[in-house]
Curated annotation (Swiss-Prot):
GO terms for cellular component: apical plasma membrane; cell junction; connexin complex; endoplasmic reticulum; intercalated disc; mitochondrion; plasma membrane. There is a cross-link at K144, K237 (Glycyl lysine isopeptide (Lys-Gly) (interchain with G-Cter in SUMO)). The modification Phosphoserine is found at S5, S255, S257, S262, S306, S314, S325, S328, S330, S344, S365, S368, S369, S373. It is a multi-pass membrane protein. Residues 317-332 have a biased composition (Polar residues). One of its GO terms (molecular function) is gap junction hemi-channel activity. This is Gap junction alpha-1 protein. Keywords: Acetylation, Cell junction, Cell membrane, Disulfide bond, Endoplasmic reticulum, Gap junction, Isopeptide bond, Membrane, Phosphoprotein, S-nitrosylation, Transmembrane, Transmembrane helix, Ubl conjugation. Residues 2-23, 98-155, 229-382 are cytoplasmic. Its main location: membrane.
């Protein structure tokens, strides 16, 4: 049992660097395998070969029949299984010790650099490199080791190898023994003179232990699979969380500016247009700053604009040599705007605006009255 205690001490150190599933797996390994194998199973198989009897007196026949029936003892087979299953965990523990050794070296170097920094040396870049190496090895504050990077890969590989060894030993056991023992074995092998019957002691008790160890192996395999999925999804979650933290650290929260929005429009003459629709992208509560259309300045502005438009139109007709053409009523309509509510109602009711009469304000003279019948080049034909 001295060898079992040494293995137990090594596996006990893995507890501090394992996940919850790994700790449960180690508990199953200690209690239901190592402890049970060292107490009950060895005593059940203690008289295995001495109690194996065959119905022959031929020397050496019992030995060859026992070797054919049991190529390897169940106890030794389970010991090999425990050792092979524990080796990946011990390799992971060796990696943890390597990381801890690296931590000691980095801490010692960091202390030396801090002493040099107090003396005025510029060692900020070297300290930053040490922090990066600690993060790479998974070393956190207070000497705590976190599974990331190479340490996480080693842990996943150890779980995979443990699962492979569990399946391999279960298949080997099924191929060699099966999962039950019979009371009588027939043997026909030299130097036995003929086919002989051999008898096994306590086959029922041994069958119970075989089934129990089979169940423990299946439970350990299930724990390995669950732990593998747990580590896989936890790694994805940590990676997504790390990217999210990096994104929030590099880009601050975007808050909409109060100054943003639709541009403001203003009529500098203080008069509003006939229709001033709001912008389709204007925010709620947004209103155009418009002037009062009933204001006298607005009415004067509309009249002046109408007169100017009419004068421009007449000048254009004269330049084109169409001064003698008849102006239609539609062209002669002034550009007038309703200046009060009553005119607006008339427009809505369908009243048309009358054309402005062209009044010649020049005083009539005798010559003009005499020559009124003669056309002048600047007169308009009516």
């Amino acid at each position: 049992m001295g060898d079992w205690s040494a293995l137990g001490k090594l596996l006990d150190k893995v507890q501090a660097y394992s996940t919850a599933g790994g700790k449960v797996w180690l508990s199953v390994l200690f209690i239901f395998r190592i402890l049970l194998l060292g107490t009950a199973v060895e005593s059940a198989w203690g008289d295995e070969q001495s109690a194996f009897r065959c119905n022959t007196q031929q020397p050496g026949c019992e030995n060859v029949c026992y070797d054919k029936s049991f190529p390897i003892s169940h106890v030794r087979f389970w010991v090999l299984q425990i050792i092979f299953v524990s080796v990946p965990t011990l390799l992971y523990l060796a990696h943890v010790f390597y990381v801890m050794r690296k931590e000691e070296k980095l801490n010692k170097k960091e202390e030396e650099l801090k002493v040099a920094q107090t003396d005025g040396a510029n060692v900020d870049m070297h300290l930053k490199q040490i922090e990066i190496k600690k993060f790479k090895y998974g070393i956190e504050e207070h000497g705590k080791v976190k599974m990331r990077g190479g340490l996480l890969r080693t842990y996943i590989i150890s779980i995979l190898f443990k699962s492979v060894f569990e399946v391999a030993f279960l298949l080997i056991q099924w191929y060699i023994y099966g999962f039950s023992l019979s009371a009588v074995y027939t043997c026909k092998r030299d130097p036995c003179p003929h086919q002989v019957d051999c008898f096994l002691s306590r086959p029922t008790e041994k069958t119970i232990f075989i089934i129990f160890m089979l169940v423990v192996s299946l439970v350990s395999l299930a724990l390995n699979i669950i732990e593998l999925f747990y580590v896989f999804f936890k790694g994805i979650k940590d990676r997504v969380k790390g990217k999210s933290d990096l994104y929030h650290a590099t880009t601050g929260p975007l808050s909409p500016s109060k100054d943003r929005g639709s541009p403001t429009y203003a009529y500098f003459n203080g008069c509003s247009s006939p229709t001033a629709p709001l912008s389709p992208m204007s925010p709620p509560g947004y209103k155009l700053v418009t002037g009062d259309r009933n204001n006298s300045s607005c009415r004067n502005y509309n009249k002046q604009a109408s007169e100017q438009n009419w004068a421009n139109y007449s000048a254009e007709q004269n330049r084109m040599g169409q001064a003698g053409s008849t102006i239609s009523n539609s062209h002669a309509q002034p550009f007038d705007f309703p200046d009060d509510a009553q005119n607006s109602k008339k427009l809505a009711a369908g009243h048309e605006l009358q054309p402005l009469a062209i009044v010649d304000q020049r005083p009539s003279s005798r010559a003009s009255s005499r020559a009124s019948s003669r056309p002048r080049p600047d007169d308009l034909e009516i």
